[in-house]
Amino acid sequence: MTSRMPTSGHRTSSSSSERGNMSVQQGKKPVVPGMSSGEDSSRPSTSYPQVPPAPLRPGWTLSRDSSVVRGINGDFHPGAQTPMSGMTHASWLTNNGNESNLSFTSSIMQEEAKLRWDSDEELKKMSKSMLRLQKWSLIIGLAGINGALIYIGWKYYQVYYFFLVLLSSNTVLQSFMCICIILHWFCTRVLCFWWRPKENIPAEPEKMVLLLPCYNETYEELTRSLDSLIAQKHIDNHPRVIFIVVDGNVRGPGMEKTTQEYLLQDILEPGPSRTFENGYRARDGLFMPVKTQTGFYKGIPYVFVGKRYNQGKRDSLCFARSLLYHFKQRSENVVTMFNNDLFEYIGNNFINAGLDDVTYLCGMDADTVFDEDCIYEMIVEIRKNPKVVGVCGHVCVDFDGSNWGYWSLYQSVEYSQTQGLRRMFQSRITGKVNCLPGCCQLIRVDEATFGDAVLRERFGYCPKPNDIMTQHIMGNYSEDSIHASIIFSLFPGCQTAQALRAKAMTIVPQDWKVFLSQRKRWALGSISNEFVMIFRPGIILIERLQSLIAVITWAITPFIIAAFVELLMVFAKRGKEVMSDPVFLGLICVLFFRYLYSFCIGFWLPRNNLERLQYFAGYVMHLFTSPFMNIIILVYSLFHSDDFKWGKTREVIRGEKDTDDAGGRGTH
């Protein structure tokens, strides 16, 4: 039987090396160039088809990656027999039962077995794309609105009076607050002969937990804060425990040890310790391993809880506040975030320290120092009204030896004006202080403050990747104001207050990077909360109005500054004519009254003459630089609104950060 021979040596279906391969697979001996089929004297002739050698196509070169010639040095012409390999001696039988001396060797590597796409990673990418789209939509929208307002204001003078209402709304509201505060002072101090609400002193002193959440604080910062708690006056008869919660185990720049190591090795007195691999369910939904230690710090009992992973300050607050609430309620057979072993362990330590019940939680930051009467003054304030569930102190700038630095003076004036105007109006008039700063607060342990409906379902909400930007902002920033707004919405009868006599000194940013990072969080967090408060149920009318005006003022900040510049130009050109206009004259009087009140804050809010001089020096600086600062903060906040990293304000050593975030347990 004869086989049909190809008509051409230039076949398009396979190369010469492939034909040799096919011969091996069929058990045939490849034809060697120059040898005919009948010249093999060692074997009888067979009826196998004979394939003549085919020359290479023009321009073809032998590939080093060929499966036949891989690993063989020198030229290997098509049709030649493959040499014996030194790597393998695997063989197989020919048709006649004889072993073949042909072999095949390879050095390929197989790719890893993994999914073609990671659902979590793709979801994160989609979330970032959505946030970026929302960010640019917001920027373009605000730029368009402000550009249109500026153009209309310059082009059409007929809309001046409408713009006056828009521009003066915030100033008029602030002037109204000033008048209410003055009238309140006049009624309570003059007409009522210095009447003050009666302090309701309980039969037994209230029992307190002093909460100190930490992250990457230094040895000096920790000892200053703890020592200020020890030095508190007039509360010696109040049973209390210092509750320290450290978020992760990291080192900040210049730190030789982590914050947990500073506390356990150098600051706190040694005591019994215990590790819980399953401590509680964190905000990310996974179980959080914690290390606990109990003992005494300068005579005051403490409970230390060190979290293995960083989950943010809000996670620490949810853990501590919810634990105190369920401890106070003696919760049984209810679903909580806590492992029962950890809950019992900490509860027993509270009882052994004399706290069979907890009335108040006093919160502070690890970079804050309390004045010696701070806690007592907050207790006095919260006793005045049983409806009050939370009190904040007066937060002052810690100048730390640099009494005339620009950053400290500027921020000191900001702090004083905020607390001396809107927060004071909320405390004295509405009873709804919408922000209890975490660096100085006293909160009643109650269903309205620390119940599951407030903490676990709303305050502790962890944003999903497909949530809108507002939800991401509120889930990461401004936890203090968001907590208060949730209380007002769910429990409209509750009130909060401010104790101006309760002084607390806090460290403020001293450079642009840290300052802008902090103000971005404050600006985005507060304005998002104000926006949500417009629509929240249970919010009183005056607070809704304040929130609405705050949102509008923030959105048209460039237009307001442009209008102010135009007003100065009009004054320069037609000053007499402007002053004869009663509308403009009334607006200027309202504006002047607002700034006069802010100036007078320097006479009654500071504690001594040095602080008064610092306030007035900062007031002048703030008056001329705040418009530029506001624009810079607005632009920076908008262009970084999709970045939810804490940046310089929570800076850690890179290697430590990687260790802390192992397993995807990072904050954001």
UniProtKB/Swiss-Prot annotation:
The keyword Lipid metabolism does not apply. It comes from the Eukaryota. Polymerizes chitin, a structural polymer of the cell wall and septum, by transferring the sugar moiety of UDP-GlcNAc to the non-reducing end of the growing chitin polymer. Participated in the development of cell wall and plays a critical role in fungal response to environmental stresses. Necessary for pathogenicity and deoxinivalenol (DON) production. Gene3D superfamilies: Spore Coat Polysaccharide Biosynthesis Protein SpsA, Chain A. One of its GO terms (biological process) is chitin biosynthetic process. SUPFAM superfamilies: Nucleotide-diphospho-sugar transferases. GO terms for molecular function: chitin synthase activity. Residues 1-62 are annotated as: Disordered. Belongs to the chitin synthase family. Class VIII subfamily. Disruption phenotype: Reduces the chitin synthase activity and subsequent chitin content. Leads to enhanced sensitivity to stress agents including acid, salt, and oxidant environments. Reduces the production of deoxinivalenol (DON) and causes much less disease on flowering wheat heads. One of its GO terms (cellular component) is cell septum. Glycans are attached at N21, N98, N101, N216, N476. It comes from Gibberella zeae (strain ATCC MYA-4620 / CBS 123657 / FGSC 9075 / NRRL 31084 / PH-1) (Wheat head blight fungus). This is Chitin synthase 8. It is found in: Cell membrane; Cell septum. The chain crosses the membrane at residues 136-156, 162-182, 522-542, 548-568, 583-603, 615-635. Keywords: Cell membrane, Glycoprotein, Glycosyltransferase, Membrane, Transferase, Transmembrane, Transmembrane helix, Virulence. It is a multi-pass membrane protein.
